[in-house]
């Protein structure tokens, strides 16, 4: 089941996140563009993909690590979504898929840091990001998730909260 195809589910999820995390999005229109486009958000928690995914159209694809799918059935189910390009132990093949997608005028969401931030600051981006930008010349959109480091799914050592 592809949850991203169900508009009612997406509206309900947005309402739940609005109540639970006080989620709100500012300037969502920036992501409503023609491809090729590369959306680069900061990465603070395990549910950042959900916050970002609710703000973009269905034609955006995600790039995600396949490692969590090896240990958890929940992660395997989430990562089985056809909108996800999995990055495995050989990142070159995933980078090729991302390049082909962008060259075809596609849109891609890439957590370019490659790992979650423990400080809340943007970390060094992986070299593959520069390669994608140089090779495909996409419109680059940056996205800042403010406060996402305080949700329970974050990895930093500070305080977290439910609501």
Identify the meaning behind each predicted range:
Residues 6, 11-43:
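Helix-to-loop junction immediately C-terminal to a conserved catalytic motif
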Residues 12-13, 80-86, 112-116:
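Short, basic, glycine/proline-bearing loop/turn elements
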Residues 27, 121-163:
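A cross-family acyltransferase "interaction/gating" segment
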Residues 33-90, 153:
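Catalytic core of membrane glycerolipid acyltransferases/transacylases, capturing the structured
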Residues 42, 65, 113, 145-146:
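Cofactor-binding loop segments of dinucleotide-utilizing enzymes, especially the Rossmann-like FAD-
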Residues 51-52, 78, 100, 131-135:
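Hydrophobic/aromatic ligand-binding patch that stacks against planar heteroaromatic rings
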Residues 83-107:
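Helix-adjacent hinge/juxtasegments
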Residues 101-130, 136:
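Catalytic-site beta-strand/loop segments enriched in glycine and acidic/polar residues
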């Amino acid at each position: 089941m592809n949850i991203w195809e169900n508009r009612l589910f997406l509206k309900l999820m947005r309402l739940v996140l609005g109540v639970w995390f006080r989620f709100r999005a500012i300037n969502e229109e920036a992501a409503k563009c023609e491809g090729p486009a590369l959306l680069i958000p900061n990465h603070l928690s395990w549910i950042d993909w959900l916050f970002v995914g609710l703000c973009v159209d269905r034609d955006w694809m995600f790039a995600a690590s396949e490692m969590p799918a090896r240990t958890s059935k929940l992660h395997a189910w989430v990562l089985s979504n056809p909108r996800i390009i999995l990055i495995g132990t050989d990142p070159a093949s995933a980078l090729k898929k991302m390049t082909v997608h962008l060259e075809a005028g596609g849109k891609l969401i890439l957590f370019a840091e490659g790992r979650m931030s423990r400080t809340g600051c943007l970390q060094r981006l992986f070299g593959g990001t520069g390669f994608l930008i140089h090779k495909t010349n996409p419109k680059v959109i940056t996205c800042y998730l403010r406060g996402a480091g305080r949700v329970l799914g974050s990895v930093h050592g500070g305080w977290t909260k439910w609501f």
